Amino acid sequence: MSDAVMFWTGWGLTGIFSAFLLLASVAPKLARHASAVDPMGKFGWDPELVVAIGIIEGVCVLLCLIPPTAVVGLILLTGLLGGAIATQWRIKQPMFSHVLFGVYVGVAMWGGLWLRSPDLRSIIPLQLG
């Protein structure tokens, strides 16, 4: 695959998952929508933390979109997703649809950066075939 195709495929993947996170996860938290606030008690979190979690998540996603800070943003987002995975697992949510959802998002986000960053590909070379 040419570098240009990898670059634009990586940005496409990053853009799709960033938009998803910002619209489906961050925005409801910042708006204190019931879909974000109500589950907090079930998860064992104080519902008052929903806006702070939304801000942290939003900052992580925005850092992922800025090339010089993308790696730091993804490291922070990976930590946040790890917390979400642990929270879902602790309350015994369904494994493939809920618990592992953070893994799916993380793999897609890291895959997008890997495709668009020759520097990351040199550090983490994947040899297929």
PLM features per residue range, with description:
Residues 34, 47-49, 53, 95, ...:
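Solvent-exposed, flexible loop/coil residues
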Residues 19-49:
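Solvent-exposed, well-ordered loop and adjacent helix/strand elements within mature globular domains
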